[in-house]
């Protein structure tokens, strides 16, 4: 199913019974968070708050609150179909030379499809139907959520930040939270390894005294939003990838105050600049860890212009102790990650980011072990292959007879196949999410790998245990008797 814009997606979800219109007055201060949190935990619908207290702009929440809705947003009917998207990304990330003329012809349609999905730039766009500039800019007119009692201020959460480095052809899309600190100022919290921060750093090195142009799209179409959180190869723009997901070219328009291109059908666009050296204390905020994070300094984004559609919809979320929307996104994107990892490590059978692990802090890998030390190679590969996993603290590796998504299986493997000293890998002084207050130094901490695989000769001198398995003939006989036994 193709969704041209957020409104098209809302309509499609409503027809499926996946969206609920909330007509009662609900405050964006704390109340929306509580309602969305309860709804998400019951795997409930997306919520369109039509009467936010004190505002005349509707708020869309819990949009990606189930893996199924994430799949729909990526153009799939089921989460299992996301594996095919992962296979495409794996191919584009590391394309193999054709093995012959026939193989070359078979791959040609893929390349043609990618080339055909170059974004389309419009002269006029719905996102610029209304233009607010200068002293009329007032972010307090947008119903930005204040999510938790201890939060420092209202927080923009689903802002799609568009940047471009001075030495790069392509633009970068990233989702970074933004603390509102005035009618026209927000704090741009981007971590140092993220694309927006890297672009800004390059700009400051080349133009240390010039303001850096930035645009933030609020309420883009689902494919563009999700394209920004997917491990897209550096050779492919997020806009082109969104076109592949959607099945049609992403439509853009030039920002009014810069050369940046923004989604033509976004509900709201913030345009402005970051002045090198202008920083502010950000936080504290309740985060996806379930705790309030420390205060840290980040650049200030000055909003010089707000453009929006007529009767815009504000798209928002909250983060908190899992499950929350980032955790649900992690569950769905699991299916995208698996083929990408398998491309580099064919021995991997499954890969799982348990939502209880705060989206990415713990990973479970099942594999077909082939030699002593193989599990350690795989765990090191997980940490280093995709930048999405550089902050993963714990990697558990098991054999392929274990279900990575069943803690009963995983814990059994850990307790029966591991010696704590021999089978634990500790790595010190590695990059850690600065939100992780458990690390001894902000941004720097350790990682642990757990080898819960069967041990091969060379890894142990002992006779290894054989798993207990019932006689298949006995199981078949009991299957035949089961109804007669009257047990259930």
UniProtKB/Swiss-Prot annotation:
It is a peripheral membrane protein. Its EC number is 4.1.1.98. GO terms for cellular component: cytosol; plasma membrane. The keyword Transcription regulation does not apply. The active site is at residue 287. Its main location: membrane. Homohexamer. Catalyzes the decarboxylation of 3-octaprenyl-4-hydroxy benzoate to 2-octaprenylphenol, an intermediate step in ubiquinone biosynthesis. This is 3-octaprenyl-4-hydroxybenzoate carboxy-lyase.
